[in-house]
């Protein structure tokens, strides 16, 4: 299965920096996601307005097919660029996704499934999900109609929901869908990493 990171462009809240380049712990969010995807994805694509930033990383970069269409436009680009029946889609601001959880999503995809989408206690998580590439024409029509909210059309699809209880089995701390949208979020993410690193050190040195 191919995977696509939706990197978008620069974020004004971070002084014009690409959110995927922000450091959480000792690695950028992009590098953390790349580590989770390697060994899982056949190809790793990055949908971005700045392909030059990802040179030398071993990923393929793709510009938005429909600029200005937000996350749905990024999803459409991923669907049209993927060479597999399904594509794993990941927003660039999720520093705590794990290979185990992404692999679980990929394993649930099949010929009778249009989408595999987590639904946490905070609601649908459509940008950490798997979609059938055959959905591309439907997504294109939604973009052309101006209906850009991804969650609006999930009920019309053959969607395999990954519910909160199922998520909690692999994510007891509730961090999988923590997204970095502000400087406060970035600070909290780094504090969480420091705390987790300290806990791991304590376990090694009782």
Task: List each language-model region with its residue ranges.
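Hydrophobic helical membrane-anchoring modules
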Residues: 186-206
């Amino acid at each position: 299965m191919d995977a696509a990171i939706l990197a978008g462009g620069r974020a004004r809240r971070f002084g014009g920096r690409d959110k995927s380049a922000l450091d959480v712990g000792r690695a950028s969010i992009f590098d953390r996601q790349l580590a989770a995807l390697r060994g899982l994805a056949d190809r790793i694509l990055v949908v971005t307005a700045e392909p030059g930033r990802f040179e030398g990383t071993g990923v393929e970069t793709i510009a938005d097919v429909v600029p200005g269409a937000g996350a749905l436009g990024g999803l459409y680009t991923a669907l049209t660029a993927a060479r597999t029946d399904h594509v794993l889609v990941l927003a660039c601001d999720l520093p705590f996704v794990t290979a185990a959880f992404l692999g679980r999503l990929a394993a649930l995809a099949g010929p009778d499934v249009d989408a595999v989408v987590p639904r946490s206690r905070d609601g649908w998580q459509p940008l950490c999900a798997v979609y059938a590439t055959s959905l591309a024409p439907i997504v294109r029509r939604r973009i052309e109609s101006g209906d850009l909210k991804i969650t609006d059309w999930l009920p019309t699809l053959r969607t395999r929901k990954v519910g909160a209880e199922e998520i909690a089995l692999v994510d007891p701390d509730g961090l999988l869908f923590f997204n970095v949208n502000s400087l406060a979020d970035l600070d909290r993410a780094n504090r969480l990493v420091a705390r987790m690193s300290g806990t791991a050190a304590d376990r090694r040195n009782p």
